[in-house]
Amino acid sequence: MNLERAIEIAVEAHKGIKDKGGSPYILHPLTVMHSLETEDEKIVGVLHDVVEDTHWTFVKLAEEGFSDKIVDAIRSVTKSAEDHDYSDFINRAKNNPIGRKVKIADIKHNMDVTRIQQIGDTERERLNKYLESLRVLQA
């Protein structure tokens, strides 16, 4: 499966959704995608939120022709009900080579304070959580 199809899926899945700053949400996965190197990393980067935030499923992605390697990497960066806490989720991403790179890129973009309209206690807590997660992922 190719990058072009992954972009089409992401654009359609995130259509009409805005981020916390009011920008089209699709700009986030596209930014994550552009910060990665290989085609597989870029595919996972642009699709990293489709299962977590939209009607897409891992099965549907596999049916679209994405390889087990790609679907497993997307799974590694998708929060699930089995995650007892955020550290379980981060450790799962860390254990997948593609997932690790994608999650690092995702967190770095999420830490861009220019995307946040106002920084309060909630945002500071989130930024601290992201900083700790980066330490774990980069260790």
Short names for language-model regions:
Residues 1-139:
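Active-site helical microenvironments for divalent-metal-assisted chemistry
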